[in-house]
A protein has these predicted regions:
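Extracellular glycan-modifying ectodomains
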Residues: 1-242, 249-250, 255-261, 354, ...
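Terminal substrate-recognition subdomain of acyl/acetyltransferases
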Residues: 338, 360, 364-426, 529-592
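Conserved Lys-Pro-Asp/Glu-containing loop-to-beta segment of HAD-superfamily phosphomonoesterases
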Residues: 332-353, 359
Length: 592
């Protein structure tokens, strides 16, 4: 639906929201259900409506609790029966500068202003701590937008008596708290208001007439921003950017104009635009976005263009380069298959509207922003919110390297006729560990990012993972895989809750980067042996179907589990007699 893509079609979003909701629910019959509490310092009904729409397009169906008008602090500090019974998965504190109870004046001393700043910050910090203690779920907090007037003009931003200066300093305190607390996230309305236009955003009519924190037409932009954070937390980010070449990464057509005729680099304004876009793409790579090329070109010409002396991107920045005369939708499908990623993990960037339309029609799930003018490419991708970062792991920072290693493995496989011999040639070592503190962040990240090889799709915060690790009733294991081509890092997670002599597997997932390598065999062998050592006689496994995890529907059957129950929605329960388990003995060394 184009109304959700930048630039947002606010008229459709606001006026046809009921129809949009029906259509989105029809498109995704198995959404992820989440409870979101909105604690507002202003009217929040439209915020909830728009946030619900944006989350639905990410496959998340939200149920909302909304505080009464301006009761955000009271609900957080003193609670309500309704909020307590709601048990939110996420709390969004929707406040703005009008919720500050004190602002400096020229009559205040700098000491008084500092004390005022501390008091205003303490008002919020105390609330965040109370929410963490009671609910232990992620909290999203607006920072503060600026008032749409400056009492002292330009001096307002640097003079301690200025409201703009005070709000800027208070925002910095919010950011310091966010940096120190892993489940706390800032929704940057300071940026959103500037991007939208502060005068329009802060139109006082909407505050005094309706008690909206911003103008009505800005609420979809606010909702898109909050939804981007939430979908990132639940693993709904895009993972890959697939790029055309001619008139996308450089100006001109390399096959016609030659490398010397391309517009790229500092010599001409057009070349500067493309160089800046290449720099942006390279920066995306640095935060874990994988890059690929899908271009109608001869491969030699494509590589020559990517080696242009004034270019920023080089061939080894890409995990796949499809430069040929095949249809681009077919190339993209091939890239997805090679990387073991679903099509909905991709963003396709191409200057040609005809190519964009074909890919959008033929490859459901891929995001296809309407690139219009090279000077707008960065803006279109950035405002799309495709790659919102809520956490960065070491694996994210070396994602391209990991995929290059997989390409080397694929080349090695081609030289073997026997798959077992190929696996032996990889010289693999699996290290199976408890949920140790060093791995907590990565484990939590995997639970929220893994969709295909994920039997229960249980999404966990770092605190959830710690709680499992510290509970003696839980048997928790994570697996790391190393071979002669490199270190894949933590790639698989299992967790089971023991009740008597039965172990219930609540969590079982694996990164698709290591499919068909035997890592699941190593984990099952280890898990069963460890369970037996704890006196477990029966292991129960659970499969909950989603739109993406059909590949593991019969996973437990392959290990000798017996299906004992199947629900109408396809959910299944399996049981294993531990004494009868036959170890798989995968083609790898297993270390503990």
């Amino acid at each position: 639906m184009d109304c959700f893509h930048y630039p947002l079609d606010t008229e459709t979003l606001l006026r046809k929201k009921r129809r949009l909701r029906r259509e989105l629910l029809a498109q995704n019959p198995h959404p992820l259900h989440k409870k979101i509490a909105i604690l507002g310092g202003s009217t929040t009904n439209e915020v909830a409506d728009q946030l619900g729409l944006f989350l639905l397009q990410y496959g998340i169906e939200a149920e909302f609790y909304q505080s009464e008008y301006a009761q955000y602090w009271q609900d957080a500090m003193f609670g309500t029966p309704e909020l307590d019974e709601f048990h939110p998965d996420i709390i969004y504190v929707h406040t703005n500068w009008r919720n500050l109870t004190a602002l400096p004046t020229t009559a205040d001393s700098e000491t008084d202003i500092d004390a005022m700043l501390d008091d205003q910050y303490a008002h919020f910090e105390t609330m965040w701590q109370a929410l963490e203690a009671k609910f232990g779920c992620p909290v999203i907090q607006n920072n503060f937008d600026r008032p749409n007037f400056r009492l002292m003009g330009n001096r307002d931003i640097w003079d301690p008596h200025g409201r703009s200066n005070f709000i800027s300093r208070l925002n910095q305190k919010f950011y310091a708290y966010a940096a120190a607390h892993e489940h706390f996230y800032i929704n940057d309305i300071d940026y959103l208001s500037a991007d939208y236009g502060l005068t329009a955003w802060g139109d006082a009519f909407f505050w005094h007439m309706y008690k909206y924190a911003m103008c009505l037409d800005a609420i979809p932009s606010l909702a898109a921003s909050v939804a981007a954070i939430i979908k990132s937390l639940y693993g709904r980010n895009k993972k890959a950017l697939v790029l055309d070449l001619d008139n996308t990464l450089w100006g001109g057509i390399v096959g016609d104009d030659g490398v010397d005729g391309l517009a790229i680099g500092p010599e001409v304004p057009e070349g500067q635009v493309y160089a800046e876009f290449q720099s942006y793409c390279k920066a995306l790579k640095s935060i874990g976005v994988i890059l690929a090329v899908d271009s109608k070109n001869d491969e030699a010409n494509a590589l020559a263009g990517l080696n242009h002396p004034d270019g920023v991107l080089r061939p080894d920045d890409f995990v796949a380069i499809k430069a040929n005369w095949e249809p681009k939708d077919r190339n993209l499908t091939d890239i997805a298959a090679e990387l073991n990623l679903g099509a909905d993990s991709f963003v396709f960037a191409d200057d040609n509207p005809a190519e964009r339309a074909i890919v959008a029609a033929q490859v459901p799930g891929v995001a296809v922003p309407a690139l219009d003018g090279a000077e707008n490419y960065i803006k279109m991708l950035d405002h799309g919110g495709y790659f919102e970062v809520t956490a960065l792991s070491k694996e994210d920072l070396k994602k391209t390297e990991l995929y290059h290693q997989n390409a080397e493995r694929a080349k090695a496989q081609a030289s073997f006729s026997d798959y077992g011999q190929y696996l032996d040639s990889l010289e693999m070592t699996a290290t199976v560990k408890d949920f140790e503190p060093l791995y907590i962040q990565r484990i939590a990240q995997l639970t929220n990012k893994s969709n295909q090889f994920n039997l229960t799709t249980l999404r966990c915060s770092e605190d959830d993972i710690r709680a499992m690790a510290e509970n003696p009733a839980w048997l928790c294991r994570c697996g790391k895989l190393v071979d002669k081509f490199g270190d894949n890092g933590i790639v698989t997670v299992t967790a089971g809750e023991q009740a008597g002599d039965t172990l219930h597997l609540r969590l079982w997932l694996m990164s698709c980067r290591v499919l068909k390598r035997g890592m699941e065999d190593a984990m099952m062998d280890t898990m069963v042996a460890d369970a037996a050592a704890r006196g477990v006689k029966t292991i129960c496994g659970y499969y909950y179907p989603t739109a993406k995890n059909a590949m593991v529907r019969e996973f437990y059957a392959s290990f000798g589990f017996e299906k004992v129950e199947e629900a109408a929605d396809g959910a299944t329960t399996w049981q294993l007699d531990v004494a009868a388990y036959q170890p798989k003995h995968p083609h790898m060394k297993i270390e503990r």
